[in-house]
Amino acid sequence: MKDKFKGFYSPTDSQIEDAWKDGSTIFVFDTNVLMNLYGYAEQTRKDFFEVLKKIEPKVWLPYQVGLEYQRRRLDVIKDEKAIFRKIDDSLSKIDKIFENDFNQLALARRFPKLSENTKELHKDISKLVSNYKRSVKYWDDKQPCVRSHDEIRSQIDEIVSGRIGDKPESQQWLDKLYQEGEIRYKNNIPPGFKDNGKGNAKDSTFSFDGLTYERKFGDLILWKQLIDKAKESDIKYVVFVTDDAKDDWWYTLDSRGKKTIGPHANLKTEIYQEAGVEFFHMYSTSTFLESGKKILEVGVHDSSIDEASVVQFYSHLPTRAHFVRNQEQVVRPFRRRKYVGPRVVYKANPSTVEVGDDVDIDDIAKEFRKQKAIFQYMMESIRKKDKSAKDLPEDDDFNEEDEGES
């Protein structure tokens, strides 16, 4: 049966290891993998490039990936820098809450005890904010600017030099692909049918170097270029790395939660039939780093693997930002991990906060929950129509240590 339905079978661990080490393998990277490099901590980027250097002769980029990367690079840099400005703006609003909202309540005259507790809370939160701003500035300084030298691009250029595919041969070739794409998308044939909505956007098309591109067919163009490359006689194994988690690349199954089984069977079947390769496999950046660490024995940090996974998750939200509305979503993947590098360390007492090398994510989660609960309780109590003191917390309620899990 396997000879007829090879696309439904996953490779064994030994086959995957052979592909990493075989000289007839190509490693192909999607645009989103390169874009996400701008959202990583410095150590994660270092680890990524360390793995790439180990397989450098096997790395290849489709022309479509190179084009999309060059067109989007500055926008991604701009968006990443904007995150730091928005963080600073949001933190600045905290002082305004105390200066405006609380001052208008005349607490010193009406509730002296509560006024003193409010001042202490303001002082504690100000220390948290001040130290957090220091860590934010550290990472902001590490990010490239739109007009500065882009070291990330320089490293990519060095690794893929001479290993980028040719541009589409003609507009006729593209137009024929678009016609095929309409049929494929109508029948949910991967890849790219989940991008069909891009055809309705204002920037649904763009032109470059004498050719007009339809954005919704970007994945299909990439895929066709990858297959053409795989047809070369000296290529037997193809590994594709993408942070696109949609069902038009991956076969997923809802079994006690959504689970990714592997590359879509249609994709594997198509490349086996069209290119005659023996092996096709796909990774996300995080699983690529994990396999590189295991198979090539590269010193990839666990924190880099974790961060690549989280950045992939947040890159698919409506806004690119790593702003977290539900902080548990970002904490959960890091349970029992330690980050290496400057981070804000939150101790049980909010007055003792420092920038250090190691961070226990559980401590951060606990401290945020504690401060949020205190602040929300105060605001709700103060704004009640009944301003009686019996509804307000005692002094000790604001100063006690949070020894256990909140």
Language model: regions and residue ranges:
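Active-site-proximal, substrate-binding regions of enzyme catalytic domains
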Residues: 3-236, 246-365, 378, 382, ...
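Nucleic-acid nuclease catalytic cores
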Residues: 239
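Short beta-strand/turn micro-motifs composed of small residues
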Residues: 242
